[in-house]
Regions:
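N-terminal glycine/threonine-rich, aromatic-flanked beta-hairpin/loop signature
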Residues: 41-81
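Sec-dependent signal peptide recognition
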Residues: 2-10
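N-terminal signal peptide c-region/cleavage motif recognized by signal peptidases
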Residues: 15-17
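Edge beta-strand at a domain terminus
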Residues: 69-87, 111-138
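Short beta-strand segments that buttress and anchor functional surface loops
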Residues: 31-36, 61-67, 88-94, 117-119
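Tryptophan-anchored aromatic micro-motifs
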Residues: 22-45, 77, 86, 116-118
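N-terminal helix-cap/turn-to-beta initiation motif at the start of protein domains
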Residues: 19-31, 53-55, 134
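An anionic, turn-rich surface loop/hairpin at beta-sheet edges
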Residues: 87-107
Length: 138
């Protein structure tokens, strides 16, 4: 257990001396899915948001897979940590590409569980934290 303790102390010192986000717990590929309304042909609106977070370079990128829904706000984001919550700010041409106010997404982390909220999630309650899956890309 000493090594872990040492690692923890070291990482605390490290983050105190560094203004960039060094919390690698945020790094990786994440996915959240939303199901929307049922359409006349029996199919259902489906949205899958894929986030790749690279905290060392202070950036994230969003790609989407969707059926029957418009795609907005895809592309690059910059990161800020605000009282333990990771906020994502869209870097693109806001007006045309992303109609939602910054930060577009907020991510919180409790243990191994991740949650995300954002105005883009139109099929959830406003301000609702949705489960965010950390995925391992093959």
């Amino acid at each position: 257990g000493d090594f872990i303790k040492y690692l923890f102390i070291f990482s605390c010192l490290w983050s105190a001396n560094s203004f960039a986000i060094t919390q690698t717990q945020w790094d990786g590929n994440f996915r959240v899915e939303e199901l929307g309304e049922q359409l006349n042909d029996g199919s259902q609106v489906f949205l899958q948001y894929n986030l790749k977070i690279d905290s060392k370079n202070n950036r994230a990128s969003l790609s989407m897979t969707t059926w029957h829904a418009g795609i907005t706000c895809i592309g690059d984001y910059s990161l800020k940590i605000n009282s333990g919550v990771l906020a994502l700010y869209y870097n693109g041409d806001e007006e045309n590409a992303c109609p939602y106010p910054s930060p577009q997404f907020e991510i919180s982390n409790k243990g191994k569980a991740y949650y995300i909220k954002g105005k883009m999630f139109s099929y959830s309650q406003p301000g609702e934290w949705l489960p965010l899956k950390r995925i391992t890309l093959k």
